[in-house]
Amino acid sequence: MSTLTGARRRANSALMRLYGLWAIRHVQHGRSYRWRGLTLSVPTGVFHPGLFFSSGVLAAEIERRKPVGLSVLDVGCGSGLLSLAAARAGATVTAVDINIEAVRATAANAAANGLTVEVVPSDLFGELGDRRFDLVVVNPPYFAKDPADDAERAWFAGADLGYFEQFFAALGDHLSVGSQLGRALMVLSEGCDMGVIAAAAQRHGFRMAVTSRTRVWLGMQVVWVIDAARPA
């Protein structure tokens, strides 16, 4: 049974990878997208939340947690769905993306929906200085391949999945401390290499626990909550 499950997951992962490549190369025109009353304009070259399930799954989890009054950082914001969901739910939101088109799209979409989101061009946490946040949300790339351009950065995490090493290495410096300990929410497909990702988290003092699972086409989207590991 476990072998069949593993084979099925590998097949789903391969299909999702092919679908991602199709989406990157064949969606050549900007288009709009609606999610629970939010309207987003998604330009060419920016991750489209309507073509994948992950963003909607994580946005729903953000809303479910009711982050009223929390400071939220959206890492790799794309067209801004997670940022807009958090802002509408009452959070103070900062969004970052290395893709300048994504930065512009998130800023424009926030304004068009009457929401306030601070948007910063940044490779992960690089341009945030010593700022800390109560909640970090991320829909990361997770396929093992070096991205060829900004569009592929939304999908490919480096040949050795180095994205996750960089993310966890810097995460602790940007989570709130004191009475309001910061945490992160990350959405991943069940087909990704959780061994590598969890090992990177552990190396940098974090633990990952499943908070929700949502069955979608070609498998499951899993939302993980990430906290600082407690001493044994």
Positions of predicted regions on the chain:
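N-terminal auxiliary segments of SAM/dcSAM-dependent transferases
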Residues: 1-32
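SAM-dependent Rossmann-like transferase core, predominantly class I methyltransferases
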Residues: 20-85, 105, 218-231
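Short, well-ordered coil/turn elements that cap or connect secondary structure elements
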Residues: 35, 67, 112-114, 179, ...
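A generic structural signal for short
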Residues: 47, 71, 95, 185-186
